[in-house]
Amino acid sequence: MQEALVSPVRSALELKPFNFGDQRLASSPRYLPSGDDALYRCSSPFSPSFGFSSPSPLATSVSLSPSSSASLVDDGDDGGAAADATGQRLQLARLALQYQEVADRYELCLSHLAEAAEEAAALRLENAELRVTNSDLALRLALLSGKHTAAVAVADEIRRLRLGEQKVAAATKERTPEKLAVLPKSISVRSTSYLKLNQQSQAATATSAAPNRKPRTSSNPTNPPNSQRAYDGGKKGDEQKAQPADSGAELEVYNQGMFKTELCNKWEETGDCPYGDQCQFAHGVTELRPVIRHPRYKTAVCRMVLAGDVCPYGHRCHFRHSLTPAERLLLRS
């Protein structure tokens, strides 16, 4: 807009070519709207406007009307003010949104803080209950440890006095009467016929032509070849036959290690045997067959037990493992 206003002024101030001679008479008289003579437009070498033309009417009108330029400036100022107001409103809207976001975050933080406070209160209550429970348990443990210590002290005193050992042994026997009475490892019969059978077996071994003989018999328990009849008593078999029937018992006995002469360990522990009917050992007392023994079987004490050691033969040992009170005194000394 300023370029449009300045361009007529520049065009009015442009230099015109120099005109020789006086052209005031040649030009027709023209009157300006303001009443001035047209001679003022003539160019003379002696006039003040030598070489310059008079300002054009457009330039005069522009230069003499400051109200139009002022109105244009006012319009520009109004547009800038409107733009500034719009920017301020946008800035205020952004600030309002940021404030709302900050307020929402503040409320969220307050809710989280309230939840954390509730959890802390619950944990404090739980810790208080746990402390009470721990103190109660500690008190009970202290009481139990005191009682146990007192019981151990009393037991040590009784052990030092060597009292109640026989009672303890009797109580142990009473706790497992079924295993000792109902489930024996074997049924032993002491008989004097054992010596005669042993001599006969030694003679048969010396005269036998077969070098190898199986230690066990066949699995047929109804008619075993090595079964013998013995009399349970202190006299010989011939004398037992002459006595009445109620003076002694006639039994069918077998040698140690034969079929069904010992109780099956697997059956005794679990009540079942993987071999079933083919097992060489007895599955119960009803299947046990008596074994003939030496007359002095289990009459002398085992030297390993008397020395305080463990006998490696176990229940198969031919010597006695139970000690009498006199033997216990000898063992302690």
Curated annotation (Swiss-Prot):
SUPFAM superfamilies the UniProt entry points to: CCCH zinc finger
Coiled-coil ranges (or none): 110-138
GO molecular function: DNA binding; mRNA binding; zinc ion binding
Disulfide bridge positions per record: none
Keyword set includes Zinc: yes
Key words of the record: Coiled coil, DNA-binding, Metal-binding, Repeat, Zinc, Zinc-finger
UniProt region (Disordered), positions on chain: 198-249
Protein name per Swiss-Prot or TrEMBL: Zinc finger CCCH domain-containing protein 9
Organism: Oryza sativa subsp. japonica (Rice)
